[in-house]
């Protein structure tokens, strides 16, 4: 086997024909400035080629079902292994995905509970055992006389297939009726049953249909006996009767000769792993379908401005835009008459009874009124009033319009399911225990608590023999999660609430558990979101992978990871068009010795981010959060000084995001920005009057499509289009500003609709994107491109970098101010028209920061940033600090969640949470200046900070 991976002529994105040789079975770190080409080399070249070669080994039939990658722009790569990418972009937003399901621990738990779980009666809690046929018959006979019974044997339960053999066997055995997916059919009247083989089906044999009478007991007993024989111990009995109004009232019960409570007759099916899945209908709660929550419209989300009257917009557009002669408006008038109230008074002053019926309906109470149509026709009405909220919920369920669904969804909040109380499963499933805990109670434990649970778990010798392999797998997976610094996470934690770093480390733990050998792993900043204290554990886990015989390529900026690496590759020297070259490679000492390497300058100490000589005094005012209880926060009171750069620190899982993102941002934004999302649990926030707005500057993309770019996002494209519309050629032709937009008809190329590229479908090969043959990739039509400013057309301007555009637009302040702030935050290399899909998270965040800097400051803005150093090199952090200091110097307050010590040491004030993560966190460990926090021996942040301040 070859000892090296050899890359020749890599030209993907900004790479300038890079030739590189890296050792196999080692830990290799790719570093360099944000936008220098690290990810282009690691992910878009090495991983893409490895993936492409694997996919090419499959049949063309299999290839058409895979998300194929385009061939990277590289001459040659030799010595590649099968490649696995572990990046930060694949966080699962599915509300059904949890830490337990993603790591497959939950699959093993389901198997464990199905095999050694002890079932209990959900009513009385006693252990339950099987029912005899006599017991089942006694239970049936206890129902009201005269009820019609349908006694059935379950044959197929939610399995895919056509099931032709099963149906043929039923017909041969002389049965007349079956129930397929809830519908009764006669097998003797139908030759073929064309079931969709790709869908799951449920089939029951109808054993007998009989009226419940004492004299029919022996016939019922015979039917039950045959049903449990055919249904492998189970029978479904349908009880059919009529209510007082004569409406059909059906109820169905499942009985089993295997498990049932003798006192309450509660029976459960034979325990199978799928019973314990909240993603399958067999065990999931029927009300919330296993989500644990239901969507409800909150009163406060409907009544957005209670100080206004209903007709003036207290409920947004509900009623305020309604025709006075409309049906609902006349009903509203009658409701007001009934309550002797005036619709012109502010909503908050209306009687409570009226407000309640307005929102939730009149129930059975009917309104009597005279309705006059627009044509003058008069009708006498007598009916109930549905209520605004039930009406919206009904429309949400009935409408096919995405627009209406989206509008109503914005008013909805998650409410804990009233049936399962957030437990996701049926009560019969929750009554099965192992070690005294049901499966949901076990997943509510943190990883560390679960490890202790399995260490102390006592099982009988028989149960130990059955579960030995299952518990071994569970213990190993839990240990790997703890090893990568995720011991504080609960197994029930929703995957969508994890940070990019957390989800990446979960996948890393899963890979360690897989035990693969000879694989090329490519990781994207695994240290993100990890406190310095936990870095050693992560590096140990990474070293495990290489010791097993794997190659690790890690895109990373963390100093500890660089020192732990066997080989470092530094890409640069700059970013964008100024990067894409191999600056240095080798050991840490080799990088330090390279004078051209900016990374080497920081590692050697020749260049560093200085500690501020003084800390800002602030305004003397405070933003106070009282009684913060969200997630693991322990009813804490937090004081945030106004007019300072504030860092919220602490180990992973200590409660930083709960405090800042859930309570602080949503709490302040609900007042200043009219945000409708409900803030995290707390008593109150004081001092909001010190701010006119709050802005959350995260690393999410500035747009989801290639049409979004830095010029459109910052607002710079408007004055650029204005400028082109003022050119003599444009005026002569009558071109307006809209002519220079590639998003609307008129000036854009209609062949590609302003995209500049067209897609060629290749079926079992990846789709190929080629420049538009009409406009050549320019995005505009020929006539529009004839209008020029200083010799350049609009398409050529979008191809300019920020650095090139600065002198080009030097006399236009409305454009220059945007360019200058982009250059100030270190983005001089990006193109004005660079598609948002090609920007890294760090670049997107700095574009947002530049946009804020270009606005006129009020000095009363609260800025919130969650780990802004993600994806940033030492030199990029230097530029970030310049921006954060500028924002703070203008009188604004900046609150940053951060683990990076270079940022923390520059803060005016630190709030350190902990001391541990999960249940061991949620308290304030230390507050004050970096110097004050460094003196706190209980603070892990303080211990590391002390070294930085020397």
Predicted segments — roles?
Residues 1-950:
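Conserved phosphate-binding elements of NTP-dependent enzyme cores
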């Amino acid at each position: 086997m070859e000892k090296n991976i050899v890359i020749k002529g890599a030209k993907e994105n900004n790479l300038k024909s890079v030739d590189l040789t890296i050792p196999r079975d080692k830990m290799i770190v790719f570093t360099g400035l944000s936008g220098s080409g690290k990810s282009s080399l690691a992910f878009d070249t090495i991983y893409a080629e490895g993936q492409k070669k694997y996919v090419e080994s499959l049949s063309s039939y299999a290839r058409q079902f895979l998300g194929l990658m385009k061939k990277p722009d590289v001459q040659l790569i030799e010595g590649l292994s099968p490649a696995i990418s572990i990046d930060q972009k694949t966080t699962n937003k599915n509300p059904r995905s949890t830490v337990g399901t993603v790591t497959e621990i939950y699959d093993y738990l389901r198997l464990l509970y199905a095999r050694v779980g002890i079932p209990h009666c959900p009513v009385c809690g006693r252990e339950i055992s099987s029912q005899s046929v006599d017991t089942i018959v006694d239970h049936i006979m206890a129902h009201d006389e005269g009820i019609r019974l349908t006694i059935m044997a379950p044959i197929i339960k939610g399995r895919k297939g056509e099931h032709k053999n099963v149906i043929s066997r039923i017909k041969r055995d002389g049965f007349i009726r079956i129930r397929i997916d809830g519908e009764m059919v006669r097998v003797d009247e139908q030759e073929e049953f064309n079931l969709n083989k790709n869908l799951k089906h449920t089939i029951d044999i109808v054993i007998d249909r009989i009226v419940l009478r004492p004299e029919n007991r022996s016939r019922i007993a015979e039917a039950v006996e045959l049903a449990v024989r055919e249904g492998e111990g189970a029978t479904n009995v349908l009880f059919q009767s009529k209510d007082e109004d004569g409406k059909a009232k059906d109820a169905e019960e499942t009985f089993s000769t295997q498990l049932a409570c003798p006192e309450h007759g509660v029976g459960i099916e034979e325990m199978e792993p799928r019973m314990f899945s909240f993603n399958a209908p067999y065990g999931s709660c029927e009300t919330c379908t296993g989500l644990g929550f239901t969507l409800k419209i909150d009163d406060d989300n409907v009544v957005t401005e209670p100080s206004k009257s209903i007709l003036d917009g207290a409920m947004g557009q509900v009623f305020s835009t309604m025709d006075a002669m409309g049906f609902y408006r006349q009903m509203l008038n009658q409701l007001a008459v009934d309550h002797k109230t005036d619709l012109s008074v502010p909503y908050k002053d209306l009687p409570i009874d009226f407000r309640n019926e307005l929102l939730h309906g009149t129930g059975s109470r009917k309104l009597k009124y005279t309705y006059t149509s627009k044509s003058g026709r008069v009708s006498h009405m007598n009916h109930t009033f549905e209520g605004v909220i039930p009406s919206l919920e009904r429309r949400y369920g009935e409408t096919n319009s995405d627009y209406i669904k989206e509008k109503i969804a914005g008013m909805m909040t998650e409410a804990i399911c009233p049936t399962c109380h957030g437990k996701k499963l049926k009560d019969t499933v929750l009554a099965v225990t192992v070690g005294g805990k049901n499966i949901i109670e076990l997943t509510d434990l943190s990883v560390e608590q679960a490890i202790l649970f399995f260490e102390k778990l006592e099982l009988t010798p028989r149960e130990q023999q059955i579960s030995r392999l299952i518990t071994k797998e569970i213990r190993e997976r839990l240990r790997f999660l703890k090893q990568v610094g995720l011991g504080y996470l609960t197994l029930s934690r929703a995957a969508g609430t994890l940070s990019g770093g957390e989800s990446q480390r979960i996948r890393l733990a899963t890979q360690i558990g897989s035990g693969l050998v000879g694989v090329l792993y490519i990781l994207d900043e695994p240290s993100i979101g990890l406190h310095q204290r936990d870095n050693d554990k992560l590096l140990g886990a990474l070293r495990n992978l290489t010791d097993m015989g794997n190659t690790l390529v890690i895109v990373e900026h963390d100093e500890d990871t660089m020192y732990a690496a066997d080989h470092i590759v530094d890409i640069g020297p700059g970013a964008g068009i100024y990067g894409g070259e191999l600056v240095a490679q080798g050991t840490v000492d080799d990088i330090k010795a390279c004078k051209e390497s900016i990374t080497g300058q920081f590692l050697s100490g020749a260049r560093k981010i200085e500690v501020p000589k003084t800390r800002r005094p602030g305004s003397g005012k405070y933003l106070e959060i009282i009684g913060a209880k969200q997630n693991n926060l322990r009813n804490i009171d937090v004081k945030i000084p106004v007019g300072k750069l504030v860092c919220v620190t602490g180990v992973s899982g200590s409660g930083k995001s709960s405090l800042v993102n859930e309570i602080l941002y949503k709490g302040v934004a609900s007042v200043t920005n009219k945000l409708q999302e409900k803030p995290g649990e707390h008593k109150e926030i004081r001092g909001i009057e010190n701010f006119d707005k709050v802005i959350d500057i995260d690393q999410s993309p500035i747009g989801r499509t290639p049409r979004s770019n830095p010029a459109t996002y910052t607002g710079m494209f408007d004055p650029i289009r204005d400028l082109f519309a003022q050119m003599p050629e444009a005026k002569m032709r009558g071109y307006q500003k809209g002519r220079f937009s590639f998003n609307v008809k008129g000036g854009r190329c209609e062949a590609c609709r302003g995209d500049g590229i067209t897609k060629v479908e290749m079926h079992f090969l990846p789709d190929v994107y080629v420049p538009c043959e009409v406009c050549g990739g320019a995005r505009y039509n020929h006539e529009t491109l004839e209008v020029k400013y200083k010799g350049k057309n609009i398409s050529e301007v979008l191809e300019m970098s920020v650095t090139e555009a600065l002198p080009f637009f030097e006399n236009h302040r409305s454009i220059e101010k945007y360019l200058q702030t982009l250059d100030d935050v270190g983005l001089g290399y990006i193109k004005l028209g660079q598609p948002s899909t090609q920007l890294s998270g760090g670049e997107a965040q700095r574009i947002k920061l530049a946009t804020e800097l270009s606005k006129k400051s009020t000095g009363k803005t609260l800025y919130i940033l969650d780990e802004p150093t993600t994806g940033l090199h030492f030199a990029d952090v230097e530029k970030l600090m310049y921006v954060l200091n500028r924002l703070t110097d203008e009188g604004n307050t900046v609150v940053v969640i951060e683990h990076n010590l270079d940022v923390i040491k520059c803060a005016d004030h630190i709030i350190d949470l902990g001391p541990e993560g999960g249940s061991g966190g949620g308290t304030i460990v230390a507050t004050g200046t970096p110097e004050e926090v460094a003196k706190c021996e209980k603070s892990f942040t303080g211990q590391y900070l002390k070294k930085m301040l020397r």
